[in-house]
Amino acid sequence: EKLERIDKVEPRLLPGVEDQVPTLFTEAGVVTRRVEETAHQAGFVFAVDPTSADASVVGGNIAMNAGGKKAVLWGTALDNLAWWRMVDPEGNWLEVTRIGHNRGKIHDVPVATFELTWKDGRHPPGATRVLRTERLEIPGSTFRKVGLGKDVTDKFLGGLPGIQKEGCDGIITSARWVVHRMPAHIRTVCLEFFGQARDAIPAIVEIR
């Protein structure tokens, strides 16, 4: 099975969020570019835009915690996930739901909360029994390394399943993403190219 289902953008009430949030459901085998195009057709932005968008699939984006240019505004895959489903090493379903999504970068919240639900993998996820549940509360600062952003060396990420694990703790099968609207006004800044990164980085930081 290729897991290529992709739905249209739809508003959803997310756990712990008062207002409806525009979301997009995809299975793990959908090519990233198709998700971008589906969101764009509805007037929204899918924030996970790696340079491999024409070749990568969203399940891989979750497993790698992929990002791209839009990560500057809305973060990486983790920041934009409302929910995801995977198969754990024992063959059971594991569904992870973000509680109180801030619709922005996850490290901006003091504590990020996730509800984990394991279901019997011998039956389809919508028609099987719940085996157990668990709640994870992880300090938002855990997900970013000060001064560097995403810490690719941290595969544990506070015990959060699936994200940045590169497939080591299970197989991603589907997800529901938060999508965004572009700001009404944008500002473009033109920068000179410097020969050395040590010269360029302080210059960028000084721009206000």
What are these regions (language model features)?
Residues L3-G16, F25-A28, T32-I207:
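FAD-binding subdomain of flavoenzyme oxidoreductases
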